[in-house]
Curated annotation (Swiss-Prot):
Disruption phenotype: Fails to produce sterigmatocystin under conditions that supports production by wild-type. Able to grow without exogenous long-chain fatty acids. This is Fatty acid synthase alpha subunit stcJ. Fatty acid synthase alpha subunit; part of the gene cluster that mediates the biosynthesis of sterigmatocystin (ST), a polyketide-derived furanocoumarin which is part of the most toxic and carcinogenic compounds among the known mycotoxins. The first step in the biosynthesis of sterigmatocystin is the production of hexanoate by the fatty acid synthase (FAS) units stcJ and stcK. The polyketide backbone is assembled by the non-reducing polyketide synthase stcA by condensation of the starter hexanoyl-CoA and 7 malonyl-CoA extender units followed by cyclization and release of norsolorinic acid. GO terms for biological process: long-chain fatty acid biosynthetic process; sterigmatocystin biosynthetic process. Keywords: Fatty acid biosynthesis, Fatty acid metabolism, Lipid biosynthesis, Lipid metabolism, Magnesium, Metal-binding, Multifunctional enzyme, NADP, Oxidoreductase, Phosphopantetheine, Phosphoprotein, Transferase, Virulence. One of its GO terms (molecular function) is 3-oxoacyl-[acyl-carrier-protein] reductase (NADPH) activity. CDD domains: elong_cond_enzymes, KR_fFAS_SDR_c_like. Residues 873-1327 form the Ketosynthase family 3 (KS3) domain. Mg(2+) binds at D1432, S1533. Acetyl-CoA binds at residues 1432-1434, 1480-1490, 1504-1506, 1532-1534. The gene is stcJ. Residues 1105-1117 have a biased composition (Basic and acidic residues).
Length: 1559
């Protein structure tokens, strides 16, 4: 077959094609030939070669068209309604009206009617929202797409479809593949409005599947049989494509493509990726790698990998804080008996703050002289004073082999060791250059055990000091002696840090420091960098090195040596030499030749004695060569050598497996085995100056082998001992199993089944203190504001779970169950077959006892402070087009908008279907989205799986309301349960609707909707129409009132940034005391949002997660208040609320009382330029002079307390460098100014170490924690404060506990809060027992009964609601009808009660009469002001009459004297003085004729009525009646050294209370 050449092809005219106009021709896209047109090619143009015949593919015939029907309104109506309500079309019932579908929400109804009116461009029927959708469809009839649906449909294609997917494409596919007519196509398109994809479809295939699914759903809804087919065009296109592609795979085409590539590469100057030389190099590298792997293996490489990183170093220097904490803890217990060991422990930590504490506590006063004397002396450690132990191996009845230890004789290690050396005639235990130093060593040991030795001002490096090791005990001894110790660890930072932090807090004495450094001694690089860090970065010089790092090689004999044994040899020998060599280099570089560093070599008598230990013996033998090198090499000026032959040391990492046969070694081998403590003391003694200086002249050898090297047949005897133990254990185990089988047989007839232990869930009501007749504050219940309920939702879920983690660091079984429920891991079922918890996913039963084991890890990893999900932040970059873009379809409105923005740089042409074809041309500017990788984030997030539906909130509300408002709603419901109120409507049986206030605030409000309003709108995304309202800070409290409370009281929304919650309490207290409200909801709420987090990061306020990760910090460690390494706060989200109540209302309702709000104060910080800078304006809360006592003092004095009675201070403590020093400074100055006793520091609570910083609810969570502290007496410690900042040491009025402290009770607390924008606030809280002291004993018992009934019912209701997912009972309508609303709001006596017979609410009247004391203007009454007043004051320090029995007999009645006898010795003087002051004030008030200064005052009797002082008894009553007085109101106020009484005579027509007169 001949082929025509190019020259033979007839020439055609030159045709120029453009991609913008001739895209179809350029891409060889052909349409269907017109009917009747000859589709054969014109062979006269080009004679193409003949190809082999391709078999014709059987193509399925085109689908038969389905008869088209006009589009009716119901399709569009259902789609728009479903889209607005966020439901599927199948959930929209055409028989229901818009009003019914919207649940009566007027906003949604209004929006839908507006959209439908705009869509159909015609007048809708009257009250269209009340008409069913079917009737609305009948009224509108046949329709077409309107403006609303076209706009929404265009948005779907723009935002969710892939590129080049247009309406026209979809219509073509629906016609070709599905055979749908134009109107049916429109119906499918409309269905997309209610089933919009969640995100953009990434491919055309995914888009086709999406539209095919909608088409199938459309057919099913109409009962149509739709059949998908392949069109002839598609089939032909596939065939032609296959033919077109086939030649491309030919050899000639590939060769041409390769030549083109080479030409372009050469022209552009691009280097060939690989050359022959590169290939040779790669082969050589591969050969070397194979050789390395064959010789050492991958395990060897991993074992020598580098670990050292100076950024991950942990420092511990806060010995002073640990000492203060321990002494204060001991002083809490009056039954403590001081021992010599306890005394010495504190003497070695003596410092000025500790002396003050000892002076202030009678229990510790005997320590004061010793502490003062020890301040100027270095700390010492007494070595060898421990009890010596011997091993015992026992086989239990169950066949378990256990190792025990018993005391030797003599029990003191010094005495025993000395006698053992003499008894065994052992010589040269310690020798140097042939000289026997054994006696010197023993004498030194005796001296160290009696007088102690000091390691102060010395620096030691110890490797291999893990838990249970000899090195770990040496570290303890060195820290006790005041040394600076650098310890290395190869473990992960967190577990190692926790261990050494605890070790330092127990053993660190005055001046000691502990540095924990990550390090792998098997790495040469690590060895060099470690020594460089010590000498270059820290600027230290080592006094001694103890390279004790080792690794176990048990079971490795010479025929099984592998890479791990080689790595161990490198670690224990080769790199020990390198390590000390690097020290020599550093010393020589610095010219240090007069202070040689002592190297303590860990030698061993085990030179193959035990066997099966790899290269252990060889590495120990190799170290011995340093003793000879000392004389033969040149580094004796820089190093001194001390070799220690370490004997059998029980329970270490290397010898733990041999503990079972240690008794055999002592009995049969006459070997002395040592405990870790004993061996540690012996080695520590070698570091003392007396023995260390001996090493400078010649190496010292210490033989602590315990005769192990003399045991010749050790291996065989030990093997026999192990076999004997196994035999005994097998025998005992067999007998135990036989006994168990016999026991089961005896019980086989019993039908009793074991009962699974169930976990009891509780709300956590406060314990009720016993009645105390000695507590009688001069107040009435109505004067008090108390906390009757509280709740929170935060990173740990509820306040109960947060308290467990804060105070204990772990969850209780009930805590696991509650958190698993909250995270949707379990759910409760109650049916015929099973009652209990089941798995949230598979529904299988889960026993209560199995929940911690099954879900514990998931709970702890998905709650608290943890890493945020990675998120790419979307930003836009503006680009100027350099060439025209391809055209795209869009609506006319969009086309006009684009033309208005870009002008002549956009070309618009109208299509027949009403859409427009738009092309952006060169020169136009567009913004292209790009993703910026957000830095890693950490925050305190709500537990994973938390959802408002779990609490019973309906789905339609969840979709409408901002997420943070839902958190607040759930939190408020829990707060009412914690108050014993399961139905908030119960409140209105006791108070009016207007007397319940809502003071919950926020700093940011609904940030999700704020982001949508300002960010999503710019992206033309679909934004909820009522998003604006959700951004207001008062909207969330409004939702609480609308959906749950239904009150008519004030909603005041404080905005105080991080101090919002405390500002909320301050406002509520003012409202209650002013009589505006009786119960108030207070607190704060805030959410997390990326933009906000980025703003904090730019301010350098939050922690840099990347830096923290580089320092080896886990997310849970990154919030470290008061720690020297703190670097910023960690954000968190959530809500916290409290329910405040007037005291008399709380008593009447029987509400639980968690605490008293004794006083609050707020202040600002004056002139400045920094909004977030912490200030000291709150010092005004402590301002006072001789005439005006401080607000703090006054708040405490009302309850009979003084400034020394404050026990704890809850600090704002955000973990920022500035705040955590400024805040303690403020409190220090306040306490000093108010005269707090030195040596009685406040326990500082830093809650944010476990919660992070939630902004607005911060103080609410802190207040919840303080209330829990009041109830339990447990002060939670700040476990993340690994090294309390030395700058805080001077604040002697504060102690910063790092572990929880159980006190004997808390009387009062101080809460401090700070917020951006000069918000400073403080709160004083008092224990509820002082409020209950206002009651008489019968009143107390009556309250106890009411309270018990209430909390029992609330506990049952809460657990039931939790198990049925109905904690939040959303109110759908008010408890009264519209006709009653006005009368209820206008009548202050209106109350709402639940009628139990009908289970409905009814309106009643209050039992107390309505106040009608206001007089009309024409009433002729005298001026209603009090006619008489009397004031008197008594100075307590000069009042001594209480010691005079005659004075008491003449001036106090029998009843008054009985009351005085109940007072304690301390308060007796104050009680007598206040009574006398009150009598004098009453006498002046009566204005009667005086009988003289010496007249008895017993005729004026002061008694208590409901806790308040009352008069008008005896002759005083007659005098008052004669003066026309109805009663005398008496007020007593207390200062530090004075009492003031004010008596007001009130006439019968005067109805104003004393408080209003004073104002």
């Amino acid at each position: 077959m001949t082929q025509k050449t190019i020259q033979q092809v007839p020439r055609q005219g030159l045709e120029l094609l453009a991609s913008t106009q001739d895209l179809a021709q350029l891409c060889y896209i052909y349409g269907e030939p017109a009917e009747g047109e000859d589709s054969t090619a014109d062979e006269s143009i080009i004679n193409t070669p003949q190809c082999s015949t391709i078999p014709e593919v059987a193509v399925e015939p085109e689908v038969q068209p389905i008869p088209d029907t006009p589009l009716t309104a119901i399709f569009i109506i259902r789609a728009l309604v479903a889209r607005k309500l966020r439901r599927s079309e199948t959930e929209i019932d055409p028989s229901r009206s818009i009003k019914e579908l919207c649940g009566g929400k007027s906003t949604l109804q209004n929006e839908l009617i507006g959209e439908l009116g705009n869509e159909f461009q015609t007048s809708l029927p009257d009250r269209a929202e009340d008409v069913s959708l079917a009737d609305l469809d009948a009224a509108l009839g046949e329709v077409s797409l309107g403006p609303t649906s076209v706009s929404l449909l265009q948005r779907v294609f723009t935002a969710k479809m892939p590129a080049r997917m247009t309406v026209s494409n979809v219509r073509e596919r629906l016609a070709e593949i599905w055979g749908l007519g134009f109107h049916r196509q429109t119906a499918v398109l409309v269905a997309a409005l209610a089933a919009e994809p969640h995100s953009r479809l990434t491919s055309l295939e995914a888009a086709y599947q999406y539209w095919d699914g909608l088409t199938e759903a459309y057919g099913q809804s109409l009962g149509l049989f739709l059949r998908k087919a392949i069109s002839q065009q598609a089939a032909r296109s596939d065939d032609q494509g296959a033919q077109a592609i086939a030649p491309a795979d030919s050899l000639g085409s590939k060769d041409l493509a390769r030549k083109q590539y080479e030409a372009l590469r050469e022209y552009l100057g691009i280097r060939t990726p690989t050359t022959k030389q590169d290939g040779l190099d790669l082969a050589d590298l591969q050969q070397k790698l194979d050789c390395w792997t064959a010789e050492f293996s991958d395990d060897f490489l991993s074992q020598i990998s580098r670990r050292f990183d100076a950024r991950k170093t942990r420092w511990y220097r806060d010995w002073w804080n640990s000492a203060r904490q321990e002494l204060l803890t001991i002083c809490q217990n009056s039954n403590v008996q001081w021992t010599d060991k306890m005394r010495e422990h504190f003497v070695q930590r003596a410092e000025e703050g500790l002396v003050e504490i000892a002076r202030a506590h009678s229990l510790a006063k005997p320590l004061v002289p010793d502490l003062i004397q020890a301040i100027s002396l270095p700390p010492v450690v007494r070595l060898g004073r421990l009890a010596t132990m011997m091993p015992r191996t026992v086989v239990t009845l169950k066949g378990e082999i256990q190792c025990e230890e018993h005391e030797r004789e003599p029990s003191c290690f010094v005495e025993f060791f000395s006698s053992w050396i003499q008894a065994n005639n052992i010589r040269c235990t310690i020798q140097s250059n042939g000289e026997d130093l054994t006696s010197v060593f023993i004498n030194s040991l005796v001296h160290a055990s009696q007088q102690g030795v000091s390691f102060a001002n010395h620096t030691y490096l110890i490797t291999g000091a893990g838990p249970g090791s000899i090195g770990q005990h040496i570290v303890r001894r060195l820290l006790t002696g005041g040394a600076r110790v650098i310890v290395t660890t190869s473990r992960e930072p967190l577990p190692a840090a926790a261990f050494f932090k605890e070790l330092y807090s127990k053993c660190g004495n005055r001046g000691s420091q502990l540095h924990l450094v990550p390090f792998n001694q098997a790495s040469v690089v690590d060895c060099e960098r470690l020594i460089g860090y010590i000498y270059d970065d820290l600027g230290l010089d080592l006094d001694a090195i103890l390279p004790f790092a080792a690794t176990s090689q048990v079971g490795a004999e010479i025929d099984g040596l592998d890479a791990s044994n080689e790595a161990a040899f490198r670690l224990m020998l080769v790199n020990v030499l390198r390590l000390v060599g690097f020290v020599v280099s550093q010393k020589r570089r610095r010219g240090i030749s007069c202070r040689p560093t002592q190297v303590v070599l860990p030698l061993s008598p085990n030179h193959g004695i035990l066997g099966g230990d790899g290269l252990y013996a060889e590495s120990k033998r190799g170290l011995e060569t340093l003793i000879q090198r000392f004389h033969s090499e040149s580094w004796k000026e820089e190093l001194s050598i001390c070799g220690v032959s370490i004997g059998w040391t029980r329970s270490t990492g290397l010898m733990a497996a041999n503990d079972l046969v240690a008794e055999t070694a002592e009995k049969q081998g006459r070997v002395l085995t040592f405990s870790v403590d004993e061996m540690g003391d012996l080695i520590s003694l070698l570091l003392t100056p007396q023995l260390a200086t001996r090493c400078e002249d010649a190496p010292v050898m210490a033989d602590f082998s315990g005769n192990l090297s003399c045991w010749r047949d050790a291996s065989a005897q030990l093997a026999a001992a192990r076999a004997s133990l196994r035999e005994r254990a097998d025998t005992a185990r067999a007998l135990a199993q036989e006994d168990e089988r016999e026991y089961r047989c005896r019980r086989a007839g019993s039908t009793q089944e074991p009962v699974d232990q169930r976990v009891s869930l509780h709300l956590g009501f406060p314990s009720l203190p016993e009645y105390d007749p000695l507590l009688h504050p001069d107040l009435v219940p109505a004067d008090a504001v108390v906390v009757v309920g509280f709740a929170e939702l935060g990173p740990w879920g509820s306040a109960r779970i947060r308290w467990e983690m804060e105070s204990r660091g772990c969850l209780s079984p009930a805590g696991y169950v509650e958190t698993a429920w909250l995270m949707n891991l379990i759910r409760h079922v109650d049916n015929v077959n099973y009652v209990g918890w089941v798995d949230g996913e598979d529904g299988k039963p889960v026993a209560d006892a199995d929940i911690p084991k099954r879900y514990g890890e998931r709970i702890l990893s998905n709650a608290g402070i943890r890493s945020l999900p990675s998120d790419n932040r979307e930003v836009f970059q503006e680009i100027v087009l350099e060439q025209d873009l391809p055209s795209f379809e869009t609506t006319r409105e969009n086309a006009e908008a684009l033309q208005q923005r870009h002008g002549d740089m956009v070309q618009v042409s109208t299509l027949k279907n009403g859409l427009c074809l738009v092309q952006l041309q060169h020169g136009a500017t567009i913004r292209v989205p790009k993703s910026i990788m957000s830095p890693p984030g950490v925050a305190g997030q709500l537990p994973t799986g938390w959802s408002p539906e779990r609490y019973g909130i309906p789905a339609e509300i969840v979709q409408q309301v901002d997420p943070v408002a839902l958190v607040l709603l759930c939190c408020v419901a829990e707060a009412f349960y914690s108050a014993g109120i399961s139905d908030p409507m119960e409140i209105f049986e006791h108070i009016h609707l207007s007397e319940l206030g809502n003071f919950v605030g926020s700093s940011m409000g609904g940030v999700v909707n704020t982001r949508a309003l300002y960010h999503d709108v710019c992206l033309d995304k679909d934004v909820q129409s009522d998003a604006l309202q959700e951004t207001y800070l008062n909207t969330a409290p409004a939702w609480v009132n609308m959906l749950y409370l239904g009150a008519a009281g004030p909603i005041k929304t404080p905005v105080g940034a991080c101090a919002t919650a405390l500002e909320s309490v301050d406002s509520a207290v003012e409202s209650i005391k002013a009589g505006q409200t009786k119960i108030c909801l207070v607190g704060g709420y805030d959410d997390l949002q990326p933009e906000e987090s980025a703003g904090f990061a730019r301010m350098k306020a939050t922690v840099s997660v990347r830096d923290e990760q580089a320092r080896g910090r886990e997310p849970g460690e990154m919030s470290r208040p008061t720690a020297a390494s703190r670097s910023g706060f960690v954000e968190s989200q959530g809500c916290g609320v409290q329910l405040l109540c007037r005291g008399d209302v709380a008593l009447a309702m029987g509400l639980p009382i968690y605490g008293i709000i004794a006083g609050t104060g707020m202040a600002s910080d004056g002139i400045g330029r920094s909004v977030p800078a912490p200030g000291q304006g709150i010092l005004t809360f402590a301002q006072e002079d001789a005439q005006n006592p401080a607000p703090i003092r006054t708040a405490l004095a009302r309850w009979g307390l003084g400034i020394d009675d404050i026990t704890v201070a809850s600090l704002h403590a955000t973990s920022t460098p500035a705040n955590d020093t400024n805040e303690p400074l403020v409190i220090q100055r306040e306490m000093t100014h108010l005269g707090r006793t030195s040596g009685r520091p406040l326990w500082a609570i830093c809650q944010k170490f476990v919660t992070g910083h939630p902004k607005a609810p911060a103080a609410a969570w802190m207040l919840n924690g303080c209330l829990q502290v009041l109830d339990t007496g447990l002060v939670p410690g700040n476990r993340n404060a690994d090294d309390v900042d030395p700058a805080l040491r001077s604040f002697s009025h504060l102690c910063f506990p790092i572990r929880s402290i159980q006190t004997d009770g808390i009387k009062a607390f101080l809460l401090n809060s700070c917020g951006f924008g000069q918000k400073e606030a403080q709160l004083v809280g008092v224990h509820p027992r002082y409020f209950l002291g206002l009651l008489s004993e019968p009143e107390f018992e009556e309250y106890r009964t009411r309270r018990q009934l209430r909390i029992a019912g609330a506990e049952r209701a809460y657990i039931s609601a939790m198990m049925t997912n109905s904690i939040v009972c959303v109110q759908s309508h008010p408890p009264f009808g519209p006709a009653e609303m006005h009368s209820i709001l206008l009548d202050p006596s209106a109350r709402i009660c639940l009628d139990s017979s009908t289970n409905s609410y009814r309106v009643t009247k209050a039992s107390t009469p309505v106040y009608t004391g206001f007089q009309r203007p024409h009433d002729k009454r005298e001026d209603p002001r009090p006619s008489t007043i009397g004031v008197d004051t008594v100075t307590l320090s000069s009042f001594n009459a209480h010691e005079n029995a005659i004075f008491l007999q003449r001036n106090y009645t029998e009843r008054e004297r009985q009351s005085l006898q109940l007072q304690s010795h301390r308060s007796f003087r104050s009680a007598v003085a206040s009574g006398w002051c009150a009598k004098e004030a009453v006498f002046k008030c009566l204005q009667t004729v005086s009988k003289g200064a010496g007249a008895a005052m017993s005729e004026i009797e002061i008694v208590r009525v409901q806790g308040a002082p009352s008069v008008l008894h005896g002759d005083a009553l007659a005098a008052a009646q004669k003066a026309g007085l109805d009663n005398i109101q008496l007020s007593l106020s207390y200062g530090d050294d004075c009492v003031v009484a004010v008596a007001l005579g009130v006439r019968k027509w005067c109805l104003w209370p004393l408080a209003s007169i004073i104002r």
